Design a protein with these regions (language model features):
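Positively charged n-region of N-terminal signal peptides that target proteins for export
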Residues: 1-5
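Bacterial N-terminal signal peptides
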Residues: 6-15
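Processing junctions and N-termini across compartments
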Residues: 16, 36, 107-108
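Sec/Tat signal peptide C-region and signal peptidase I cleavage site
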Residues: 16-22
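Immediate post-signal-peptide N-terminus of mature secreted/exported proteins
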Residues: 22-51
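Compact alpha-helical subdomains of small soluble proteins
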Residues: 54-129
């Protein structure tokens, strides 16, 4: 009797538990934007694209998130000349990431920001060989 009650309670709790959720896509988009900003703003830096793809998988992002975010970032940074416009939510996430990154760069100064990114984004950016 106790075993049956335990099983029913366990099954009920499992049914009520929220499903595992992917980490916030906005956090991933910000990470990507910072990696690409470091490539452009910090001399001798390049992006390790495959590691960004792996990070998306680790964060349980939907397939294609890295590529759609890359295209949206390019589209916004080039005024629509490169990349592709993403859905409104993605474009909002990219715009917010751009604003926060810009504020960080101004607050810290570019050299300090670059030095910080080398540590913060280790694995996603590296020095050019």
């Amino acid at each position: 009797m106790r075993y049956g009650t335990f099983m029913i309670l366990t099954a009920g709790l499992m049914a009520l538990a929220p499903p595992a959720q992917a980490e916030n896509r906005s956090a991933y988009v910000t990470l990507m934007l910072q990696a690409f900003a470091a490539k452009v703003q910090c001399p001798g830096t390049e992006v390790v694209y495959q590691d960004l793809v792996q990070k998306a998988q680790d964060m349980q992002q939907a397939d294609g998130t890295t590529e759609s975010a890359r295209k949206a970032i390019a589209w916004l940074l080039t005024g629509g000349k490169m990349g592709e416009k993403g859905d409104d939510t993605l474009m909002g996430e990219v715009a917010l990431a751009m604003q926060t990154t810009d504020l960080d760069q101004k607050r810290l100064g570019m050299q300090t920001w670059c030095d910080t990114q080398k540590t913060k984004l280790a694995g996603f950016i590296r020095s050019k060989s």
